[in-house]
UniProtKB/Swiss-Prot annotation:
One of its GO terms (cellular component) is nucleus. The lineage of its organism: Eukaryota, Metazoa, Ecdysozoa, Nematoda, Chromadorea. Residues 83-119 are annotated as: Disordered. Residues 203-463 form the NR LBD domain. It comes from Caenorhabditis elegans. This is Nuclear hormone receptor family member nhr-79.
């Protein structure tokens, strides 16, 4: 398959012309949604200069993305024509395979509480059709009134001759009601897509804000530089400092403030009790340590084996650092100095092998990573909260999973379900390493290798 460059977002995965312009499947789907729902977006920039539209940040400014679609040559009339053809097929042949694929409700899927108990499941052949694909749309037609039930509520006046013949033709009535039901399901499905894209935008924005604050805290950049572009990663290679076990602190008080700001905007966070908020906050702090360093390592060193910590330090992993039998190497001031080096470096090596390398192979986009991080936090806490908190966790992880399917399709993966499956399965990797990391830190504090009152307070929590 010949691939070109998308004229909208510069993605290298433009395989065809969509609505009159060479574009990737993601931008084509965005244009279709925007025109079909007659959406009007507000520019996130200054309103004078167009925002940058890049395939790594498609969710940033939808106003400028839509303008760029139209500038590239996409035509709204082609979207309308496509919808009319679908509607005609629905009228003339209820059994048309294309009509059913477009409008029919998806097969029943596991509910929010058992997504992860029954995952993965087998997808039907048509399940991943991206225009629109079944996993994106809830079963919209469940509550639509059936034709027989509807006829009980329709009272045709005695002077039926005064009405057009169309209302005396039951087949035509059935056909028109079918068309209305299908159109209703289509519009409702598009509205649900829009809600889920908004959720993806929220989590992505929170990660970008966290990155901006880290850039201010841990680099020598000018303050104005944080507004140059959305902060996909807080560091460049020039910003990094070599990992030093003597000065290394996993987090300081500013870091915990950043995490609190990050988690405060999670949907339904305010509905949790005080103790449940504390649990979610502690978990977010632990997950942030593991996942953000894996993402930074992937972005800054995509082809090199280098671990980048959340506070902007780097540790080469090829060859692996030697930690055993180094006490008499002459590089350490005391036994305590060596013990600190051994514990911290061993922990970083394990995190590299168990988390960073698997994450690097997944090569997640910013939107995928943002959803993955939030999903890990919510899912981890599902087993730790009370009944109401569990219900909130269940709703949020269900929403994130469906949003992840939508994003994987939007980014042009051949199989959104397989891609989302790979990302969701990595949640278990992160959860397992959280336990290992906490165990290492307990050893550090027990032996007074690291005197950190904030860390000791965090470790009172049973992860």
């Amino acid at each position: 398959m010949v691939r070109g460059k998308c004229m909208v977002c510069d993605s290298p995965n433009a395989t065809n012309y969509h609505f009159g312009a060479q574009s990737c499947k993601a931008c084509a789907a965005f244009f279709r949604r925007s025109i079909a729902m007659d959406q009007c977006y507000e520019c996130l920039g200054d309103g004078v200069h167009s925002c940058k539209i890049d395939h790594t940040l498609r969710l940033n400014c939808r106003h400028c993305r839509l303008k760029k679609c139209q500038k590239a040559g996409m035509m709204r009339d082609l979207v309308q024509a496509k919808r009319e053809i679908k509607s005609d097929k629905g009228k003339n042949s209820r059994n048309s395979s294309q009509s059913e694929d477009f409008f029919s409700p998806p097969p029943e899927q596991p509910g929010p509480s058992n997504y992860f108990d029954q995952f993965p499941w087998q997808a039907s052949e048509n399940e991943m059709d991206p225009y629109p694909s079944s996993p994106k749309i809830r079963k919209m037609s469940e509550n639509l009134m059936g034709i027989d039930e509807l006829q009980q509520f329709i009272q045709i006046p005695a002077g039926v001759d005064d009405f057009p013949d169309i209302f005396t033709d039951s087949d035509e009535i059935r056909s028109r009601m079918t068309s209305i039901s299908e159109a209703s399901a289509y519009v409702t499905g598009m509205e649900e897509e829009e809600r889920l894209f908004g959720l993806a935008g929220l989590y992505t924005e929170q990660v970008i804000n966290l990155n901006m604050r880290r850039r201010i805290t841990y680099t020598d950049r000018l303050l104005g530089s944080v507004f140059d572009a959305p902060c996909v990663c807080p560091y460049d290679k020039a910003d990094l400092k070599l990992f030093d076990h003597r000065t290394y602190r996993q987090k300081n008080r500013n870091d915990y403030t950043m995490i609190l700001d990050y988690i405060n905007r999670f949907p339904e966070f305010e509905s949790l009790s005080k103790s449940e908020k504390t649990v979610l906050f502690r978990t977010a702090a632990a997950v942030d340590v593991l996942l953000d360093q894996s993402y930074y390592s992937q972005v800054i060193f995509p082809t090199e084996d280098v671990l980048v910590t959340a506070n902007g330090e780097y540790l080469p992993m090829n060859p692996m650092p030697k930690v055993e039998n180094q006490r008499d190497s002459g590089n350490f001031h005391s036994d305590e100095d060596y013990d600190r080096f051994k514990m911290l470096t061993s922990m970083k090596v394990r995190q590299w092998l168990h988390v960073c390398e698997p994450m690097k192979k997944l090569d997640m986009s910013l939107a995928e990573f943002s959803l993955f991080k939030a999903l890990t936090i919510w899912h981890y806490n599902y087993y730790k909260l009370q009944c109401t908190g569990k219900q909130i966790c269940s709703r949020q992880r269900d929403d994130i999973f469906r949003t992840l399917l939508l994003i994987c399709d939007d980014e042009g993966h051949d199989s959104a379900l397989i891609r989302a499956s790979e990302i969701v399965l990595a949640v278990g990797i992160a959860m397992a390493e959280v336990h290992e990391m906490v165990t290492s830190y307990i050893e550090i504090t027990v032996y007074d290798v690291l005197d950190d009152p904030i860390l000791k307070d965090m470790l009172k929590f049973q992860y």
